[in-house]
């Protein structure tokens, strides 16, 4: 039973992200590099947030449960803000790298666009965030079947898996919207990204009232997904084209007469 719960929750949590990785990232070495580098940036933000929380816990009264709970909420907010700061730092780094790649190419264009970088970096933030948020829970799932014996919810593992899947998708959407907002200097969009991230993090403190946390988080996920889709240039026509497996016709015209070999004398 433990193994079934483990594999089931793992597929729920990381199935969408793994599919996105295989289809859109794994075949391009440059995207893989961006994915790994983005995970490193997220890890640094987590390290700094952990240091801040660790110091605050040890300089305050550890016997005060209410104070420690407040510090936990404060630490989560600091972690969110640091993640967004490092997302911006990663955007700046990728922007410089994009300019360098464009200068080295023969046609003066970068082999990867900013939108593609935004998508891959967001996916990297989401995957590493999901791994750190659910890995201990999945490890416990392999243990003895004690879920719910002490009054805990029997849906703890399953809801944690669905929450992790939502967080991974949200980071992907946040990355697309965040990079586009930086490109167009839309500060209100940056504020909405940070605000929705803080809201999502705050909603997790409502657990184990999963109806009050999971449903709003998925509502935010759907909203951010639509926003990211429109930001990336999506439309109803593009959806219809993808469903019908049609490719956009190339508007360029090749003059074949210019490619003919001149006749020999």
From Swiss-Prot:
UniProt entry keywords in alphabetical sequence: Endoplasmic reticulum, Golgi apparatus, Membrane, Notch signaling pathway, Transmembrane, Transmembrane helix
Ranges facing Lumenal side: 1-2, 53-68, 140-158, 208-213
Disruption phenotype: Full embryonic lethality. No live homozygous embryos are present after 11 dpc.
Parts of the chain on the Cytoplasmic side: 24-31, 90-118, 180-186, 235-265
Annotated transmembrane regions: 3-23, 32-52, 69-89, 119-139, 159-179, 187-207, 214-234
Complex formation: The functional gamma-secretase complex is composed of at least four polypeptides: a presenilin homodimer (PSEN1 or PSEN2), nicastrin (NCSTN), APH1 (APH1A or APH1B) and PSENEN/PEN2.
Stated role: Non-catalytic subunit of the gamma-secretase complex, an endoprotease complex that catalyzes the intramembrane cleavage of integral membrane proteins such as Notch receptors and APP (amyloid-beta precursor protein). Required for normal gamma-secretase assembly. The gamma-secretase complex plays a role in Notch and Wnt signaling cascades and regulation of downstream processes via its role in processing key regulatory proteins, and by regulating cytosolic CTNNB1 levels.
Name of protein: Gamma-secretase subunit APH-1A
Gene that produces this protein: Aph1a
């Amino acid at each position: 039973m433990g193994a079934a719960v483990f594999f089931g929750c793992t597929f729920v949590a990381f199935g969408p992200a793994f599919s996105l990785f295989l289809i859109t990232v794994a075949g391009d070495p440059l995207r893989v590099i961006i994915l790994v580098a983005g995970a490193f940036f997220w890890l640094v933000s987590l390290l700094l947030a952990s240091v801040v929380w660790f110091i605050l816990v040890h300089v305050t009264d550890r016997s005060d449960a209410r104070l420690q709970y407040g510090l936990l909420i404060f630490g989560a907010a600091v972690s969110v803000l640091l993640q967004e700061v490092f997302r911006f730092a990663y955007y700046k780094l990728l922007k410089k790298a994009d300019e360098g790649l464009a200068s080295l190419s023969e046609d003066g264009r970068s082999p990867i666009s900013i939108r593609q970088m935004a998508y891959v970096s967001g996916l990297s933030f989401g995957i590493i965030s999901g791994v750190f948020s659910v890995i201990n829970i999945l490890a416990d799932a392999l243990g003895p079947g004690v879920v719910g014996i002490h009054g805990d919810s029997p849906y703890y593992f399953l809801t944690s898996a669905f929450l992790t899947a939502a967080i991974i998708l949200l980071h992907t959407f946040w990355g697309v919207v965040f990079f586009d907002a930086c490109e167009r200097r839309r500060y209100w969009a940056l504020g909405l990204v940070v605000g929705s991230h803080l809201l999502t993090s705050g909603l997790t403190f409502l657990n184990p009232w999963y109806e009050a946390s999971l449903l709003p988080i998925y509502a935010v996920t759907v909203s951010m997904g639509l926003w990211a889709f429109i930001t990336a240039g999506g439309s109803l026509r593009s959806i219809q084209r993808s469903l019908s497996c049609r490719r956009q016709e190339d508007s360029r015209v090749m003059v074949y007469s210019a490619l003919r070999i001149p006749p020999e004398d």
